[in-house]
Amino acid sequence: MSTIAQNKGYISQIIGPVIDIEFPNGTLPKIYNAISIKHKNKTITCEVQQLLGDNRVRTVAMNSTEGLQRGIEAIDTGSAITVPVGKCTLGRIFNVLGEPVDELGAISTDRKLPIHRASPLFTQLETKPSIFETGIKVIDLLAPYKRGGKIGLFGGAGVGKTVLIMELINNIAKSHGGVSVFGGVGERTREGNDLYVEMKESKVINEKNLEESKVALVYGQMNEPPGARMRVGLTALTMAEYFRDNNKQDVLLFIDNIFRFVQAGSEVSALLGRMPSAVGYQPTLATEMGALQERITSTKEGSITSIQAVYVPADDLTDPAPATTFAHLDATTVLSRGLASKGIYPAVDPLDSTSTMLQPQIVGDEHYVTAQRVKENLQRYKELQDIIAILGLDELSEEDRLTVARARKIERFLSQPFFVAEVFTGSPGKYVSLKESIDGFKMILNGELDDLPEQAFYLVGNIQEAIKKADELKDK
């Protein structure tokens, strides 16, 4: 306690969320140390960013600095911001400091970890690439996820990002015995609240027994200071790392939105007086992104697979923020408004979504060849659509008509009923193994199911269900 008592300073300057603190000679806190300021029944936590000389440090506040003034006492906590980890975090909502904000009472745990940690050593990494099976046909077949990889999720409003995220959370819990951590970085508070309510409705969060929930939520929304938005991703990542390293689990880490993490870093950089780089971004953009992304990986103990929603400013893919993100991604899942308007869910675009895992030496020849044939078929259908729109189907050659018929069946077979959507659709969710997906698409491509009506393939699980549905349609 004596060192803490010794390490007291006083606020010397406040510029918005940036606070300069003067300490007695020889007691300067370290970079990234948390500084606690108590004022009028509230505690403000700041993080040391720069040592200015003359016994002064420059810090960035994680809470609102409203009401602070020069001369108020500030105490060096002696360590970085620490957050609770473990089972107690499941089903709860936290802020950047690891404080629960869901009004369900305090967290009772002594297990806390600092948010600034080194990435795993090279010797701890799992080097053999393996597929992370999601049970969602379109993803597993055409743009498979890497276990311990990073996936970019692209899509506008209302195309099904949230439902896809919730289905992934549900499936990892059921099939991998894993948990998920959701980091809401700089997005709308209303969206965060909607997600929480939907998770309770779909039983992803178990209200009766919180520790049986499948997800922990960490929010630093749009109205928070830039310091909080910049660090909330690290808070979520620290919770995920504990599940991977100590519980030896497979973890899904969702970051919505990775662009807001960069944006907050840019605001902080400007407030600290750093010279801006290209397009006004921080000069440390690549370093900050690397520090976050390098901690998301597979080790010999478990894995963190990260799915990151990527906002592309003004649809400019060359903007430094998305361009820096792309360098770290192993797969991209692109959601299409066109497919959503056709009622095909999940509305994952089979031609725009990509994955570095789709190589014959990783997924095997059968999977690779089937995926390529599906894409070729859909691409040919896309090329023929203009002709169909102008002249009609009858003007196509016999071969092209067959291609169109199969492509329409494939398009419908890529749809799938979700577990988390059961409450809305009334149809039970389906988990389809990769083997079942490959077998089903091979049968369609080989013409074994040419005599089945295309509506038999819509919103079913495996191919046997489609055949059964076709029989039921015939009976009607």
UniProtKB/Swiss-Prot annotation:
Residue ranges that the Swiss-Prot or TrEMBL entry lists as coiled coil: none
Gene name of the encoded protein: atpB
Purpose of the protein: Produces ATP from ADP in the presence of a proton gradient across the membrane. The catalytic sites are hosted primarily by the beta subunits.
Superkingdom of the organism of origin: Eukaryota
Family of this protein: Belongs to the ATPase alpha/beta chains family.
Species this protein is from: Galdieria sulphuraria (Red alga)
Name used for this protein in its record: ATP synthase subunit beta, chloroplastic
Presence of the UniProt keyword Zinc in the record: no
Subcellular location: Plastid, Chloroplast thylakoid membrane
NCBIfam families according to UniProt: atpD
Membrane topology classification: Peripheral membrane protein
Residues that bind ATP: 155-162
Record's keyword terms, sorted: ATP synthesis, ATP-binding, CF(1), Chloroplast, Hydrogen ion transport, Ion transport, Membrane, Nucleotide-binding, Plastid, Thylakoid, Translocase, Transport
Main location: plastid
Assigned EC number: 7.1.2.2
Quaternary assembly: F-type ATPases have 2 components, CF(1) - the catalytic core - and CF(0) - the membrane proton channel. CF(1) has five subunits: alpha(3), beta(3), gamma(1), delta(1), epsilon(1). CF(0) has four main subunits: a(1), b(1), b'(1) and c(9-12).
Enzymatic reactions: ATP + H2O + 4 H(+)(in) = ADP + phosphate + 5 H(+)(out)
